[in-house]
Structure formats: C-alpha cells, structure tokens
C-alpha cells in the first residue's frame, strides 16, 4: 500500500481531476495508474510531474521506444519495481522484444559492474574523452 494511499478519480479535487483527464486522454487509457493516484496528495507536484513526463517522454531526438528502454534501464539500476513493470509494459507496446529486454539487462549489469570498477580504481578520464561533451 502506498504511504498515503491513493486518490481515486471520484474523490479527487477538480484540479487533480483535470490532470487525471489529461493523463487518460494523452495515454488513451480509461483509468489512471497508481503512481499518479499516489502523487495526487500534492496536486502541484502531480501536475508538474505529469507535464514533465508528457513533454520528456514524447518523441523527439530519441524515439518513444528508446526513451522507454532508457527508463527501464534506469529503473532497474534504481530497483524501482513499479517503474520496471510500468515502463517494460509501455516498451513492449512500442515494440520491445524479449531479446531486446534481455540485452538491455545485460548492458545494465555490465555498466553497473564497470562503473563500480572505475570508481574503486579511481580511474582518471582520458583526454580523448574529456573533449566529448
């Protein structure tokens, strides 16, 4: 159970309902997911988080599937079970295959392991990498 519980649509303030309505319309869903219902205890944060999510997760220089794969990778590293489940489902809808998911997990595992090795050895950055920014 969420720390503060969930605010369901029928119990939501008009301000929260407006955000819920936008989420449902944008995502073409008929029910707001638990993440948003948990954030609704702070309507300002709910609105800001939704606006940021809507903008950043929209296709841009990176396509929608790539953004979902990045979201899954970061969520795996952060051990956010909810985010892994939600964004793996979204990535599958956008074309992620089982092979892609398994390869993503391999990259996440390799990156985490190598990051720890670099940190432990306190490896200085090569000049050739400093210019890349």
Where are these regions (language model features)?
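Hydrophobic alpha-helical segments
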Residues: 1-133
């Amino acid at each position: 159970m969420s720390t503060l519980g969930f605010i369901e649509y029928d119990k939501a303030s008009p301000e929260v309902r407006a955000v819920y309505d936008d989420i449902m319309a944008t995502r073409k869903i008929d029910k707001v997911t638990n993440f948003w219902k948990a954030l609704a205890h702070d309507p300002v944060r709910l609105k800001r988080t939704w606006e940021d999510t809507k903008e950043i997760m929209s296709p841009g220089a990176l396509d929608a599937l790539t953004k979902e794969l990045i979201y899954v990778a970061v969520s795996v590293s952060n051990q956010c079970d909810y985010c892994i489940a939600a964004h793996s489902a979204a990535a599958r809808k956008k074309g992620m295959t089982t092979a892609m998911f398994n390869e993503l997990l391999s990259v996440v595992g390799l990156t985490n392991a190598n990051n720890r090795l670099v940190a432990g050895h306190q490896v200085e950055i090569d000049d050739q990498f400093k210019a890349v920014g």
